[in-house]
Amino acid sequence: MARNEFVFLIDVDNTLIDNDRVAVDLKRHLTQEVGGRRQRRYWELFEELRQQLGYADYLGALQRYRVENPRDSHVLTVSSFLINYPFANRLFPGSLDAIEHVRQWGPAVILSDGDAVFQPRKIERSGLFEAVEGNILIYIHKEEELADVQRRYPAKHYVLVDDKPRILDAIKRVWGPRVTTVFPRQGHYALDPVAVAKYPPADVTIARIGDLVAHDAKTLKAAARPTRG
């Protein structure tokens, strides 16, 4: 496989899609369907599962809720709400423009963590699948799969866009100056000063994903710092 000059690896949740808004909508729907107490129990199960898996699994948490409440007919309604959610309405402003912009210099690839059902559904319904021409990678722990990323999308230089400082730092430690890390300050991870302070700053920080259009490949590559830690 020919090696690209650049490959742009872009996260989904709170990078391209406002997942915090999705969670707010789900909480509201759960409260309407099952009441406040059971809504809170769903999120307890959700957090337990996230700790176990390392990623958010909305349908998995709903299945656990169903085991605890086998005769709750509202489970099907909540499942339908998730599967048919209008994710395209939750794209951050400028998300698709940012993808189109970077594709001038190389493939744009979705690099995400998640389950094997809901995450692909989210990517498809949001229009992101089409925007990146089907270049989708979904892992359990993406920072542990860099060899596979390189095999599938070989490049002289990578640009990684992610709202989680932990992920940016972990991948920077492996790839060093071969990757430019870009930190869009969107979502609860990016806006948590304690969480952000735990890690070195990204090579490039932008206020929102749409601001990526102000950067070209040459300047992004020049911004890459050496390996940290």
Regions found by a protein language model. Name each.
Residues 16, 108, 160:
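Conserved SAM-binding loop
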Residues 1-44, 67-68:
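Active-site neighborhood of HAD-like aspartate-dependent phosphohydrolases
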Residues 59-60, 64, 80-110, 143-148:
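Short, acidic loop-to-helix structural element flanking the phosphoryl-transfer center
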Residues 96-109, 113-137:
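Substrate-recognition/cap helix-loop segment adjacent to the acidic, metal-dependent catalytic center
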Residues 1-5, 124-160, 164-229:
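Asp-based, Mg2+/Mn2+-dependent phosphohydrolase catalytic module
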Residues 11-12, 111, 161, 184:
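Short hydrophobic segments within beta-strands
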Residues 15, 22, 116-117, 166, ...:
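Conserved Rossmann-like nucleotide-cofactor binding loop
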Residues 22, 33-37, 46-83, 101:
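A metal-dependent, Asp-based hydrolase signature
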